[in-house]
Design a protein with these regions (language model features):
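Glycosyltransferases that elongate glycans
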Residues: 1-287, 297-299, 316-431
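Carboxylate/His-rich catalytic cores and anion/metal-binding grooves
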Residues: 100, 303-311, 315
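The conserved SAM/SAH-binding core of class I Rossmann-like methyltransferase domains
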Residues: 290
Length: 431
């Protein structure tokens, strides 16, 4: 671990005025920089480092010891910040009216290096600008693994201060039980009472579930303060603090703890992002969709079909892992919005479409081998049903083009690649 930039001072630091060597005037600009720390976590034989999920959990603990900031931004290594106002836009959703139940803010993914025709549907705007935006009207968009701003306490296993995930048309069943659940003695200690109890305040899970670091565990009640920025009390990055931060990133720290199961990013699947967001939603937390221009973050897209299909194979494999695990949305908490549950079911079952697509494209061809037409002669009702289905698909296509703000050609490319992925990556994941 290396501290590249320490905590800034509390007073403003104005830059130098314009000069012959530097024509830019910074005399009215605050040039303080936030703390910058480079962390390389320990990996050793005999301990599963859990890839990205393990790295994010290690960084969560490390940052809690050093800054305990109320918000955490997750960006993949192939993404960069494109708009300096992106964080301000995301934090507005965390600090606005009735925002105390917002767990994370998801930004749409944008990519550079994509060919002009977007042959492999890398932009995927139907999903990022259509589906995610539509989910914002329920409990919010799913977590897609990057470009996401988290509220720190949601990663520690805390429940939301109140639950209101239902709507006038589709009320949540959890609303019937929310009052009884949150009137139990002690549960309201997640806010003011936790701070009043001091450093040994309320924790949603036993202390041992968070590990053996007293400095880290003591930071959790402060992070649950009702005023978010009260949690980020700057500490001096001295030798003792650095040693403690290194200790919480060791390979053995998570042994016999709740990390990866009840705390932090979830282990056991290649799509830890979807499961982590799902765990928050079933507790009653909400998420928000934030799309700004210029684009908040920009990433690098796969440059050939092999890389793109491998990416889709990994996603579809992870979706099936979720479907056949205890995180199956069919059996989720009643605090999950009914339509949000449908969205998660769609996310975990879409690879199965490969079976039906292969069936419908290969079975008719058997007619040429057998000499018999397998499909029965169409009836009048068949044409009626066919007209209804085709009309519905046409309406959905028009709405997707309108809501996602894409052209008909972009919509066609998206459907074209779906056919390609269904006959290859989806099928490989299912088999």
């Amino acid at each position: 671990m290396q501290v590249l930039v320490n905590h800034p001072s509390h007073s403003r630091q104005l830059g130098p005025p314009a000069s012959a060597d530097n024509p830019l005037d910074f005399s009215m600009v605050d040039v303080r920089l936030p703390m910058l720390v480079y962390v390389s976590r320990e990996k050793r034989p005999g301990f599963n480092h859990e890839k990205k999920a393990g790295a994010m959990n290690a960084l969560t603990r490390c940052s809690a010891v050093l800054t305990n900031s109320p918000f955490i931004l997750n960006l993949d290594c192939d993404h960069y910040i494109n708009d300096s106002q992106a964080l301000r836009a995301g934090i507005c959703f965390m600090l606005g009216r009735d925002s105390d139940t917002v767990a994370f803010v998801q930004f749409p993914q944008r990519f550079e290096g994509v060919d002009p025709t977007d042959l492999y549907a890398n932009h995927n705007r139907i999903f990022f600008d259509g589906t995610l935006r539509a989910l914002d009207g329920m409990q919010g968009p799913i977590y897609v693994g990057t470009g996401c701003l988290f509220r720190r306490v949601t990663l520690y296993g805390f429940d939301p201060p109140r639950i209101n995930v239902g709507g006038p048309c589709f009320p949540s069943l959890g609303g019937m039980f929310a009052k009884a659940r949150y009137e139990k003695p002690g549960l309201e200690m997640t806010t003011k009472a936790a701070v009043a109890k001091g450093k040994h305040g309320f924790l949603p899970l036993p202390r041992k579930a968070y590990g053996k670091s007293e400095a880290f565990v003591d930071s959790i009640p402060r992070a649950s303060h009702p005023s978010p920025f009260a949690a980020g009390a700057a500490v001096v990055a001295d030798e003792a603090t650095i040693s403690e931060a290194v200790a919480v990133t060791t390979a053995a720290y998570e042994k016999k703890t709740g990390w990866g199961s009840n705390i932090g990013w979830v282990y056991g699947t290649v799509t830890e992002d979807v499961v982590t967001g799902y765990r928050m939603h079933i507790k009653g937390w909400r998420s928000r969709y934030c799309s700004i221009y210029p684009h908040a973050f920009i990433g690098t897209a796969p440059i050939n079909l092999t890389e793109r299909l491998y990416q889709v194979l990994r996603w579809s494999t992870g979706s099936l892992e979720i479907f056949f695990s205890r995180n199956n949305p069919l059996f989720g908490s009643t605090f999950l919005h009914p339509l949000q549950r449908v969205a998660y079911i769609n996310i975990t079952t879409y690879p199965f479409t490969a079976i039906f697509l292969i069936f419908y494209t290969t079975v008719p061809a058997l007619s040429f081998v057998t000499g018999h037409f397998i499909v029965q002669r169409p009836t009048t009702m068949f044409y009626v049903y066919l007209a209804i289905v085709l009309g519905t698909l046409l309406i959905l296509a028009v709405l997707e083009v309108k809501w996602a703000g894409v052209t008909v050609f972009e919509w066609f490319r998206n459907g074209q690649f779906w056919m390609t992925a269904s006959c290859s990556a989806y099928l490989a994941a299912v088999c």
